[in-house]
């Protein structure tokens, strides 16, 4: 191989490595976002469950008052 071809190959490899590193960073960011969203989803589900329990209790109280 000529030096020019080796130089071109080296440049392409370096570009590929840089692209891989950037993609790894993006993947890590997306994983962190996903984890945060999963935690937020869990908290919202707990809040919804709590509100459902409160509403069920209030409906029960209203039912008792009507009877």
Swiss-Prot record:
Family assignment from sequence similarity: Belongs to the ZapB family.
Keywords: Cell cycle, Cell division, Coiled coil, Cytoplasm, Septation
Keyword check for Cytoplasm: yes
Gene: zapB
Domain of life: Bacteria
Subunit structure: Homodimer. The ends of the coiled-coil dimer bind to each other, forming polymers. Interacts with FtsZ.
Protein's organism: Shewanella amazonensis (strain ATCC BAA-1098 / SB2B)
Record-given protein name: Cell division protein ZapB
Subcellular location per the Swiss-Prot or TrEMBL entry: Cytoplasm
Coiled-coil ranges from the UniProt annotation: 3-59
């Amino acid at each position: 191989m000529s030096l020019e071809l080796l130089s071109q190959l080296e440049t392409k490899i370096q570009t590929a490595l840089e692209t891989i590193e950037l993609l790894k960073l993006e993947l890590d960011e997306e994983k962190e976002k996903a984890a945060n969203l999963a935690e937020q989803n869990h908290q919202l589900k707990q809040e919804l469950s709590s509100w459902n329990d409160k509403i069920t209790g209030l409906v029960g109280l209203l039912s008792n008052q009507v009877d």
